[in-house]
Amino acid sequence: MSGLTEFFRGDISRASRVALLVVALALIPCLFLPVWNIGLKAPQYPQGLELKIYSNELTGDLQEINILNHYIGMAEIEPDEFREFIFIPFFILRFLGFAVLAALVGRMPIAAIGYIDFSVFGAVMMFDFQTWLTRFGQGLASGAPLTIDPFTPKFLGVTSIGQFEVTRYPAAGGTIMLLAGALGPVILIYELVRRRRAAS
C-alpha cells in the first residue's frame, strides 16, 4: 500500500508529460467539433436525417425530426431544455487545464485527479444522455397517428422504431475525447513499468 501511495505522489516522466500535452491539444477541437451524431432513416426521408450534438448546441434536421416525433407521439426536441450545453465547454476547458498543468509541473497527483475528473464526467454524461433518450422513448403520447409501444433507445448503436431506423455513434469530437481518455491508462501503465524498472 505504501508503494502505491508513493507512486501516486511521485513525478511523471518526460514522455508522459508530452503525452499529456498531446491530450490537451487534442481537446481543443472538441469545443468546436460535433461530439455525438444521431441519424434517422424513414420512408418519408429515404436520404436520411441527422442531428449533430456539439458541446454547446444541437444542430441538423431538427424540424423534420420533430415532425416525425409528433407522428409517433414523442415529445419535441427543444435545444433550450438541454442545460448541459451551458457547462460542458467549461468542463472540457477544465480537463485541458489539468492536462497542461500536469505536463508542466510533472506531478502524478495532478495527472491522476485530472483523469479521475475526466472519467467521472464521461460516465455522468453517458448516463445523462441515456436518461434523456429514455424519457423521450418512454413518454409517448396517446392518440398519435402511428401507435407504437414505449421503448428505451440506446445511446450507442442502432434502434428500430416502427418504420424508422435510428443510429447513434460518436462524432469527431466524441471520438477524440474517447481516444484522449484512453491515453490515461496507457500513461499509468507506462509509469508503473518505468518505476519498477528503475527500482530493480
Q: Where do the protein language model's features map onto the residues?
A:
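Hydrophobic alpha-helical membrane-insertion segments
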Residues: 24-36, 113-140
